[in-house]
């Protein structure tokens, strides 16, 4: 088996690398993080760990179980007692946890082991030195004997003069021998001292390490999140509780005896009880200390965050944030969504540092990953011209003449309700036209047309002059900083007045070149074609001055002009390409939707495969219906496009929720009257997205203080069964604008009697909704005076009390109508007639100029000169 590294082994056994290296070091193996570990070294480490913590070590915990069986007599239902068997089981666990004994024992064992090791080593060294000394002495003795024999053989005669030299040699040999023995003994003593010192240091190190490990283990047990029945503190408390429980029985038995005996025994019992209370264990005491200083954190805040999430980021309770926002003037709930600026103010107010993060990093990355290199050449493109003006001033008819097609006849009611996008080839070049609605309800649609355009052609009828939507079109053109060309239409009519048009336009900042301004004027007739060529020439001249250029090659980008849901084709979007080339098969990201282009068609319905700059095109294949005005961008990766679309949808939802600040202080009193307002519920479906937005804005604007238009559901496409069911459940009106209900929806509509209405002209829709709202208004009542009588005399009647003899001066006095009594033109009584007589005959009414007797019910203080006014309450029809 191949060797493994220390890091890999630590991962396998579930320990940190530093701890494993420390255990290797304790086992006598020096290893680093990247070193290999052999099987022999693993076995050596395992043997060491077994020796330290293995099966041979003494047990540290012992569990004892005890069972007690007793019998308890209880009273039965019939007055007889019965015996109940009671079994009590107790489990106790004894743990060996004396830290001092463990440390002392470890120190003694280490010291004894070190001394034995030093003694053995010293004995071995002494034996070796003795052996070496014996060998040296034997060798020296043999050499001396050999020398002596040789000398004796060589010298037969020994003179007395030579004896001092022999003695000197012998003394020198003995001196050398003594010096050698002393050096050997000194060396042995030094080595023994070193071994003893090394053993002492090892024992001290081991004792410190063992003490530190024991301290860490006890601290971990004390600070760890133990179960209430397994922690050391809990076990100590449980043991104390068991002891108290055993003593409680004896105390209860002795209590009655003490009461009987009284006196000293009772006092002793109370004193003993107080002593037991004073020595109660304090093992369950709380050990948390509150921080003395405020904690400042780095809070990372995205574009939106809820109150609970912000509280979690700042490690505070949500109620603290709610209190802080109440101090700042806003009431919020725990699940309310806050925008980034508000969350930043709250966090900084509470003393934290704020780090703003951008959550749309993927979106930014996807949109930047395009073929926009510096080497791509810019080419001239066709101008995008928007036709704007008041309703029925001839915008579509003028465009119709330019295109040589009957477009206006196809619009319902002869008015434009969609943005029409067309491109026209002229002799001098191509022009792309956007035809916008002129009705007041299509303000947002006209604004989108001005945003996506290069030149605005303002159509003004020569016989009608400047109208409200004309002024609005001028404002859109100025806001978009777009050049404005005025086309004065209907010049063929005899009542055409050019000077009036110029004068009215000059009041709104549009001056003709003849009057010293910089706006080009063209006088045209959409009926005869007069001046149309001059208008086209002026458009191309203005485009040449603007030097319109765009990238033709590369990934396309554009804007959604219109979108709809087709029953057979699915979501369809009309896109005006602004740069690059849009091809079939490209992956497009349109606002909240995405998809791969399955088919492309031009404005005439012909299939095409690509479209360059300034070309309007219909695309199929999106995941849903995009909103008009969304930017359309070609991206590389469909998966990333899907992620960006989902992120945008979530962000749109969060922003929508953040705007619904129902609980703000400034809205609180307005919300109190919500129950008093009547609601007209509407389920709205339209053919295209732009018309849907326009109708929604118009209907919402009809709301008053008494009646509110509530669009509970809206969408693009046919009316479905789901829409019909929702309308039936919420008592709503179903409105279809240029769409129809399918078969399943018609069944539900008939069975539930849902009010279904179809419209093709927006005027009729708004008028009928107004009429429905008028019917929901609370009726208004008005008091109308029908007669006036003057009191001429007062008579007393025993039955009726005071009777006023009156002359009718105005109108008719009716007996059934309520009256008022006026004195000096001040109302002093309001009630009803009790009797009305003429010549002692009861009558129903008395006309002007006749005398009559009037008895007022429950009122006798009628005086001469008073006036009696008769009135009736009339209901007045209300209008919006």
Curated annotation (Swiss-Prot):
Major location (coarse): cytoplasm
Ranges of Basic and acidic residues composition bias in the record: 143-228
Region of interest (G1), ranges: 389-396
Annotated region (Disordered), positions in chain: 143-289
Region (G3): 435-438
Species for this entry: Shewanella sp. (strain W3-18-1)
Gene3D superfamilies noted in UniProt: P-loop containing nucleotide triphosphate hydrolases, Putative DNA-binding domain, N-terminal subdomain of bacterial translation initiation factor IF2, Translation factors, Translation initiation factor IF- 2, domain 3
Its biological purpose: One of the essential components for the initiation of protein synthesis. Protects formylmethionyl-tRNA from spontaneous hydrolysis and promotes its binding to the 30S ribosomal subunits. Also involved in the hydrolysis of GTP during the formation of the 70S ribosomal complex.
Biased composition, class Basic residues, residue ranges: 249-262
Similarity remark: Belongs to the TRAFAC class translation factor GTPase superfamily. Classic translation factor GTPase family. IF-2 subfamily.
A cellular component annotation (GO) from this entry: cytosol
Compartment(s): Cytoplasm
Residues annotated as domain tr-type G: 380-549
Pfam families to which the protein is assigned, alphabetical: EF-G_D2, GTP_EFTU, GTP_EFTU_D2, IF-2, IF2_assoc, IF2_N
Residues noted as binding GTP in the record, renumbered to the chain: 389-396, 435-439, 489-492
Keywords: Cytoplasm, GTP-binding, Initiation factor, Nucleotide-binding, Protein biosynthesis
Source superkingdom: Bacteria
Region (G5): 525-527
Protein name: Translation initiation factor IF-2
SUPFAM superfamilies: Initiation factor IF2/eIF5b, domain 3 (SSF52156), P-loop containing nucleoside triphosphate hydrolases (SSF52540), Putative DNA-binding domain (SSF46955), Translation proteins (SSF50447)
